[in-house]
From Swiss-Prot:
Name of the protein described by the UniProt record: Mobilization protein A
Family matches, as InterPro entries: Mobilization_MobA, P-loop_NTPase
Disordered: annotated segments: 311-356
Residue ranges with Basic and acidic residues bias: 328-356
Record keywords, A-Z: Conjugation, Mobility protein, Plasmid
Gene3D superfamilies xref list: P-loop containing nucleotide triphosphate hydrolases
Top-rank taxon: Bacteria
UniProt function note: This protein is essential to promote the specific transfer of the plasmid in the presence of conjugative plasmids.
Amino acid sequence: MGLSHKERREYGRSYKRDNNRTAPFSCWPRWIRPGGWSGHGGMSGTTRTGVTARLAFWGGWLSPCLSRAGEKPSCVRTSTRTQIITCCSRLTCSGLPGARAGWLSGLCWRGSGVLLLDGHFAAADEAVNRKLNRRAGAQPATGEMTDVRQPAFRGAGTVNALARFFHGRGPETAGVFLGKDEQGEPVLVPRDTWRKTNIQILGLPGSGKSVMATNALIRSVRDFGDAVVYFDQRGPVAALLPAHCPNFTLLDLRPGKPAQLNLFRDLDQYALKNLLVAGFNLSETGHVADHYRISEQKAAKLIAEQVSAGGKHSAGAGGGVRAAGGPEKGREGADHQAGERGRPERPADGQRHRRGGDNQRRRLLYVIGSMDDEAVIRVQKMLFARCAQIIIARDEFRRWPHASIMLDEIKYLLSKYVLNALGTVRSRDCNLRLAHHAGRLRAAGQDLPADFVKTTVLDNTPIRWFYRAASQESRSGAGQTGEIRVDVERRGPAGRRGTWSISAGTASSRRSRPLFDVNTLQHLLTGSR
């Protein structure tokens, strides 16, 4: 084999560590002199290095035993493929028949041993030598990491998510079904964790994140009696929800639809001012542009005072700006925004809904918004701010039904109310479910720094629900799942020259890596999380 004494010793230690037992004698290479017994024969002056159980058995064990029995073999010729034993008589016989009888019995003993045991030892030799050849083969300089996980992805298969939502006893009644993982196994979130934790859902368009989130929310309403407010920008599941949620309310904010909601009904001036600040992005950012925002905030305050006093909010918008004494740019911006918002905010008679009644047990409010109409986007922001106001106004010493607020495509709903609600509504038995692409958090509102938005969302969403990602920025979310320690082995250039293996040495170290790397997220099948 050409292995050095150090390599043979290292192999023995690794064999004992991996198999929890010492290596068998066939695994211990040793210097064997096949002709070393007598010094005669053509192989008496040669030495060989190899892992050969037959050499160790016949040369190291059997021959001394036969020598003690009275036989003195002179030469044993051995090869690595076959074993040919030739015994030459060097007996100093004095004509005694017993000496020759002992020699013949020893020869018969050796012959029967070759026939019966040689095949077994040959198979053991081949297995051990094959393993050693793989270890001593040529290997380029590389870095390898070991990990306990085996990311062997299976087919997603067909999953009837609603079929898993059954009534009765069993493990499924105590958890919320989210889908299947990369191994094809169901993922269940315990009920206690579901009602105490905000969840962030990330994935490509069409990966199934909205569908599975809808299934989870249906179960929350139907089986657990939760109240759900669902903000959706497209409305693809509006026809599915009434069949599973009897207390279903649809609020369509798309352009061309009749007014269905009065956001300003029964509001005091402070709550109304906060709605205007959230809808028009009037929060201070710390930049020089805050000079104009302060004037616009004064205008929003005056509008709120006039509305609470009985004036019309649409007519009082311009007067409020002028009364605030703001600069010309501030007056123009507020007049334009108030004009854009005047029509959708005015409800039609007989179609008004009071938002406070929607937070009852087993109710689902489904809001269809828009991703391109600025007026509708502002209404969405103010509607969520109103939901947060209702939740925060709950009596903390009273038991309320759990509420879940689903924000699909959070980019079009981002405001300071959303970020503050991640931490404030949890104390009122309410949690948020945020669905978006990883890069969409950077496209926040003009009053929200992108880094501040990203940090706040990550810190307040312990559960991250990942689907298949394509872009590098989306795959970077894998680093948010925590890290594990792995072993890194670096080997120098290695090669083989004849029967000798040459190696420059190895170095082992430990390093950290994400629990789920980018390859895991990129190769998830459709329907897996």
